[in-house]
Amino acid sequence: MEVSRKKIYNPNSTESVNERKIFGGNPTSMFDLNKIKYQWADHLWKTMLANTWFAEEVSMNDDKRDYLKLSAEEKIGYDRALAQLIFMDSLQANNLIDNINPFITSPEINLCLVRQAYEEALHSHAYAVMVESISANTEEIYDMWRNDMQLKSKNDYIAQVYMELAKNPTEENILKALFANQILEGIYFYSGFSYFYTLARSGKMLGSAQMIRFIQRDEVTHLILFQNMINALRNERADLFTPQLINEVIEMFKKAVEIEASWGDYITQGKILGLTSSLIEQYIQFLADSRLSKVGIAKVYGVQHPIKWVESFSSFNEQRSNFFEARVSNYAKGSVSFDDF
């Protein structure tokens, strides 16, 4: 069944709080936040606000010097990883505003989506700071999303589910788009993230890694947002979660693992100490299993986390003053984990 975009002005609505729906509701479009149906959305909104940060807070002075000292392979990996992150946050900012939020009919969730779109724009600004501070290949990095055929192939696949929703906004396609967002936020960023942390573990590009830590913390809240929307929909519209749809979702995850593992191998070229092809593949498989289990779908791969040190590098729950000396003061800001929701 085709779903209509919500009205931006709807004074005739008599929808009560308990009648609110993830999509297909009849909201007034007023943000009456004294009445909340999805309490997790209110909690998440406050966490996102507490996590506010700005790219200029992160010093990139040492990174410019470090970049010049990177090996040719390390520079290629840095540029490729950054180019992919730039594309995904650009895509996601537009996707949320133009393609997802218009169909979501819960005001408390609308707020979270608008905040997420702001954060995707903030990430785009952070990447611009990184590119301008470090790389001599500014235009090359910004054009790589369509000029590098390996990257373009990945981007084409990522975008196709969103484009299908824009073309054919059925209930099933909305649900598939929510899963696609979960995959983007929970899988497609992580080869790039782990690459920056691997450099930082060797004492290189510490400012870049700190920027990525802030970005990843935001992405965790985005992942939780879509997982909670999926789980709420499972309660509201169990009829949509057919065996056929679940099988399609599992295939989406399998394809994502294949694409992201291949991308990670392309970034590292088999020449980055600490990130072998097999480690990257197992890491992405582990992430896929984790994401599937969070939305009530059985794990596919049954593998262990192969690079647990990445978690300590990305965590804001520990003061790593010897690693990120410039930003110890920010560790008091909001942190988030799956256990919070």
From Swiss-Prot:
Note on cofactor: Binds 2 iron ions per subunit.
Highest taxon in the source lineage: Bacteria
Gene Ontology molecular function terms on file: metal ion binding; ribonucleoside-diphosphate reductase activity, thioredoxin disulfide as acceptor
Binding site residues for Fe cation 1: D89, E120, H123
Active site as annotated: Y127
Keywords on record: Deoxyribonucleotide synthesis, Iron, Metal-binding, Oxidoreductase
EC number: 1.17.4.1
Residues bound to Fe cation 2: E120, E185, E219, H222
Subunit structure: Tetramer of two alpha and two beta subunits.
Entry similarity comment: Belongs to the ribonucleoside diphosphate reductase small chain family.
Protein's recorded name: Ribonucleoside-diphosphate reductase subunit beta
Originating species: Helicobacter pylori (strain J99 / ATCC 700824)
